[in-house]
């Protein structure tokens, strides 16, 4: 009897309970009190938060360790030392710039000065170099520098001083019996005085003092008297 009364009371409560839904539809699911719903929602939120915390912890453990960056300005340096360092660095940079500018200025000079030995050798080959002097009957050779003489007269006087027999001071030799000849760059034997002195110095390779009788035909009588 009591069970029947309880069942009737539950049916009455269920019939009069407000529900969300269309009229005439019945909810067979048992209704839960509001307090229980809130407790279940809180438990679900706590479970989700715990799962999210676990995921974040796992991600942090899996991530590589962050490199330690050096603290700027450590160890501390006093202000007067900083100023000294700055002055030294500025002076070093200025000295490097000065050295580089000097090197850049010296490069064209060295490039232009490189052909100097070739130019000097060419000048020595063209004229003014030492030439050998030989004399018929003399047992030795001499060398003279043609750049030291301004003309044929000075050259003859120097040759007379070199060879005593050619000047007539010994053995009673007569200077008029000898003639001065030279060998040019082509190897031809020519009489001294047939060309200007500058041309002679640039083409003369060897001097020879020979007897005038052997030099006949090499030049005019005026040239043979030089």
Curated annotation (Swiss-Prot):
Compositionally skewed regions (Low complexity) per UniProt: 42-51
Biological function: Aux/IAA proteins are short-lived transcriptional factors that function as repressors of early auxin response genes at low auxin concentrations.
Xref: InterPro entries: AUX/IAA_dom, AUX_IAA, PB1-like
Encoding gene (name): IAA12
Family, as annotated: Belongs to the Aux/IAA family.
Motif (EAR-like (transcriptional repression)): 18-22
Tissue specificity comment: Expressed in etiolated shoots and roots.
Matches recorded under Pfam families: AUX_IAA
Protein name according to UniProt: Auxin-responsive protein IAA12
Region (Disordered): 22-57
Induction: By auxin.
Species the sequence originates in: Oryza sativa subsp. japonica (Rice)
Upper lineage: Eukaryota, Viridiplantae, Streptophyta, Embryophyta, Tracheophyta
């Amino acid at each position: 009897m009591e069970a029947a009364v309880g069942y009737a009371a539950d049916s009455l409560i269920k019939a009069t309970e407000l529900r969300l839904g269309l009229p005439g539809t019945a909810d067979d699911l048992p209704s839960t009190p509001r307090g229980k719903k809130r407790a279940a929602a809180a438990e679900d939120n706590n479970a989700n938060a715990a799962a999210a915390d676990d995921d974040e912890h796992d991600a942090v453990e899996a991530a590589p360790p962050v490199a330690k960056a050096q603290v700027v300005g450590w160890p501390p340096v006093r202000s007067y030392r900083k100023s000294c360092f700055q002055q030294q660095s500025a002076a070093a940079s200025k000295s490097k710039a000065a050295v580089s500018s000097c090197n850049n200025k010296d490069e064209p000079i060295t490039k232009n000065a490189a052909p100097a030995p070739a130019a000097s050798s060419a000048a020595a080959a063209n004229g003014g170099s030492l030439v050998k002097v030989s004399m018929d009957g003399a047992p030795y050779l001499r060398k003279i520098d043609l750049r030291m003489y301004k003309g044929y007269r000075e050259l003859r006087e120097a040759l007379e001083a070199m060879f005593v027999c050619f000047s007539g001071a010994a053995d009673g030799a007569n200077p008029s019996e000898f003639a001065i000849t030279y060998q040019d760059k082509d190897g031809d034997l020519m009489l001294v005085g047939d060309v200007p002195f500058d041309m002679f110095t640039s083409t003369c390779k060897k001097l020879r003092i020979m007897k005038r009788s052997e030099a006949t035909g090499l030049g005019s009588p005026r040239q043979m008297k030089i």
